[in-house]
Amino acid sequence: MNRRKFLYNCTALGIGSMALPSLRSAYIPGTVPMGIVVHSYANRWQSKAKSQKYPGFSNAIHLMEHCHQIGAGGIQVVVRDWTADFANKLRDKREKLGLYLEGSIAVPETQADVPKFEQEVINSKEAGANILRTVTSKGRRYEIFHSAEDVARFKKNALASLRLAEPVLRKQKVKLAIENHKDWRADELVTALKQLQSEWIGVTLDFGNSIALLEDPMEVVEKLVPYVFTTHVKNMGVEEYRDGFLLSEVPLGNGFLNMQQIVTLCKQHNSAVTFNLEMITRDPLEIPCLKNDYWASFNGVPGIELARTIRMVKANKYRSALPRLSHRSIEDRLEVEENNILECLKYSKEELGLK
């Protein structure tokens, strides 16, 4: 039995956490190459730019064809207004190319939304998706919530939506994976999952988002990984600015997160977990954690977590200035986007065993 087979079998038997020489050498290889989240192509998805080299993707089939060409294992793409005919065509394309498919879907806000939600779940399933990623907020916590009451209302409404969705998921046997989308802190999301107690609702584990909420990225992984269905793979760059710090997705080999350790933990907890690249090519996000307005939605979060985060930013300052793209031409942005994705795919195969 070779080493790869041995490590994979250890995971399947539930003994993947046994002592091994090092996390870098003991990562558990994936069974398929890393997939691509549609947001990795934020500049190219449904783009109207007249680029000969980087034409826009008008639908999921076009995205899937391209991702197959560059060596990805699958895609995670928005499910919205798919017809039964389109779902069938996407299924045929997926089966021909041998890729996996995951959807990204909105949960129902009211009972009146449930029929549409169920139809989208059915169409997703028909196309071959049995995992659907979702978010339960309209934006980033520190931008859209301005009081503890706002946060409490968000949690209440999110739980109500998920309870509307759960019977549909159970009936259709499709899993829903909630992303830590700069809205839920890890403990809050775990509490919600425990309240729901459904085998059909789990987590889309985003490797870097929760840094924006002053959380230690490895602590977030350790708290959420028992519930992981799918992932948003990314590495992060940080640097200080006047009101806090800047946060940016960077190519997987260039950031400060321990990618091998995170992948290993995910595989230990769910041997069928999928790894989907979310390499968003854009200007850095401003995390204004030194401004009073930022703290309006963080009732009860101790100052020590701010201090820890600032220390982390200082210790892991990006090797040069974080990339800025907004001043560049659309053709340049498309080129950088594609090169970033190709670099990440190469890293995932060579360093993470996702091949």
Question: Where is each model-derived feature located?
Answer:
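N-terminal twin-arginine translocation
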Residues: 1-5, 16-28
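Histidine-acidic metal/acid-base catalytic patches
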Residues: 4-11, 27-35, 40-52, 60-65, ...
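Active-site acidic/histidine proton-transfer and metal-coordination neighborhood
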Residues: 16-22, 82, 97-101, 108-202
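Acidic (Asp/Glu)-rich catalytic clusters
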Residues: 27-30, 64-69, 83-102, 116-129, ...
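Hydrophobic faces of well-ordered beta-strands that scaffold small-molecule active sites
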Residues: 32-39, 75-77, 101-105, 132-134, ...
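Active-site mouth loops of central-metabolism enzymes
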Residues: 40-58, 104-114, 149-153
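Acidic-and-aromatic substrate-binding clefts and catalytic sites of carbohydrate-active enzymes
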Residues: 76-87, 107-115, 142, 180-187, ...
